Amino acid sequence: MEHKHHGKSSAKFLDSEEILSDLNLKGDETFLDAGCGDGYISKKAIEKYLPNGKVYAVDSYPESVNDLKNFIAENSLDNLIAIEADITEGIFEVDDGSVDVVFMLNVFHGFKQSNQREDVINEFKRIIKSDGKIAIMEFKPVEMDWGPPIDIRISHAELEKIFGDYGLKKTYLNVDIGKDIGETKSHYLIIFEKE
């Protein structure tokens, strides 16, 4: 079974403030929201967390990117840039070593299924600064009534191994973030940096 998630938003069940505050942004970083969907994380980042920063909102879904471009124009934002791109093929508008934080929410599991992890990780390594961070937030691989099929979810331990194979080390892990599901939360957030 192929899992498609293009254009879906996590805004209804994940709090952008909880997520962004966990990233400890200073306010002047360059931030890339990979697979941004409707851009709710990007919009909140510019509004509250990166007043002197720059945000690239990247998605392969044209409708999402066009909606974001309209939002940018309506609000005269020059530090939010919407880019239509397939991360596996490269984000050509973003220079090598220019991003402080790459953030990906509920997207990496799709590359587990499509076997394009290597392309994604190498692109992230290309665009982050030498001290840059890659933050991945994903559904925990546990049964819940929503989210991707459990067989394509990926654990934080799996991610740590995968990213480690590419010379990236885990520097932060929060296993208690997202929507309440019983005695735990729906997601985890893991951050990697170059070794």
Tell what function each PLM region has.
Residues 118-130:
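A short glycine-rich, Lys/Arg-flanked "PGG" loop and its adjoining helix->strand segment in the class I
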Residues 32, 37-90:
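Class I SAM-dependent methyltransferase SAM/SAH-binding core
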